[in-house]
Amino acid sequence: VEDARMVIDMGGEHIGVSYGKIKRTPGQLDCERAREIFEGVQPQAVRIGLTVAEDIDEISENLREAMPDVLHLSGDIEGISPAEVAELKSRFPELKIMQAIPVLAGVPLDEQKVMQYVKDYEPVSDFFLIDTKAPAAGDIGATGLTHDRAIDRAIIEATDVPCIIAGGLDASNVAEAIY
């Protein structure tokens, strides 16, 4: 909580944590700890809960315990369907959904399902987080890998859903990603 408060005091507007009852990723917090952090930054910060879980009942239970403002779905995109995301939204009407869109590193756009994912998840997503997926990985992001930034542009131009770009960004390449 102390670190999260420090971020808010320095001007941060969003606090995100990976959380859940079943530990799936390094650094993942349990629901109780996530709730403590989220309560510690209210009402100053938007609270983002990241999950790689794919079972909506498990996700719902975790949501009830931690109560983020935004749910960042970062697991295998084919593991939770748009209909299941819609069900989550009906269970938690105030919840915003940030759907991770996987862009395969080193793979041309026409050989990926990216644009189909955008079309399929657009009706149930409040934000897209465009991130690099290692070709052999199940989850999306946290690889340090970059991808073709022209794909980011294609996605942004194809949707009205606000997009956040990610994927190996650092001081040497963030300007290129923005332009």
Question: Over which residues does each language-model region extend?
Answer:
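Conserved N-terminal beta1-alpha1 strand-loop-helix module at the mouth
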Residues: 1-179
